[in-house]
Amino acid sequence: MTIVDVAKNLNLSIATISRAINGTGKIKEETKKRVLDYVKEVGYTPNAIAINLSKQKTRNIAILVPNITNSFFSNLVNEICKTFNKKKYNVMLYNTSESRDLEREAIRNIAAQRVNFVIAILVKSNYTNNPLKRLQSLGVNCILLDRDVENYTFNGVFLDNYSGSYEITKRLLEEGHKNIGIITGESTITSSNERLKGYKDAFKDCGLNIDENNIFKGKFNIETGEKAVEYFKNRNITALYSVNNQILLGVLKKSLEINKHLRLACFEEDDVIRALGIDVLACKIPVDEISEVLLQSLEEIKDGKTYIKPILIK
């Protein structure tokens, strides 16, 4: 039996169970007694690592990032480090390279260390057994960032992917573009699906039909952008919308002068592309606001708040 099972059987949060067992934090005496009586009855023995984490509070935070070469993620991590370092937190970075195997390995490493908080941008959104549940069972607090997950409830800070994508597409339509190609990422990632839905709904709300042949589905990587350029070569599109900057880099790698023929758009603004003077319609992601909201969420969890309603950054 794990602490997750105890929490589920008593219909309480993992954090509440942990506080009752370890005698830390604020908890009602009747709740504490109920927990202690139950664990004694079933013979539950807390994991030694979890006890160590609860009694030896650290200021160690781990960040899981799926692709540090993505300028959005690197800028975001840089801002998070600056924000948290000011508060004397130690930040450890794990780059999972969009690999579930590397993600599992990173989580195993985190579980073996004295880490109290994990900020996770997971590789996928659909898991049969979410790896973060392992960390929660050890008393590690987890906050999802950017990508939500299905069938699990975690604290989280997310971008408004739908609205941003809707506004980009609407702007292109207002500029007179009706034949707009879109390059999306994996359907197993919520942000990709939300951005595609924003694109489709913008067409619908403008009374226009969607040409499914103008949707190229791939991955959040440069290769997808390169393949998409070949795909759209004879599609007579006038605008091309990449749902992340890695895809856009692939588009430009295939044809650096493509912007002379097509109106380019990207969900995430890229500093390098902007510095090169390439005109791209894009959302400016408020990484400073995201890092401050993450810090605020972490402080609330430290103060005993076990669940924070997911926060949407517009």
What does each model-identified segment do?
Residues T16, L53-T69, N179-G185:
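Short beta-strand segments enriched in small/hydrophobic residues
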Residues M1-T58:
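N-terminal helix-turn-helix DNA-binding module of bacterial transcription factors
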Residues Q56-K170, E230-N234:
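Alpha-helical recognition/docking segments in bacterial nutrient-uptake
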Residues E230-K314:
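Flexible loop/turn connectors
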Residues P66-N75, L93-L102, R147, G156-E167, ...:
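Hinge/beta->alpha junction and helix N-cap segments in small-molecule ligand-binding domains
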Residues K86-K87, L138, F203-I210, R235-N236, ...:
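Short helix-capping segments at alpha-helix termini
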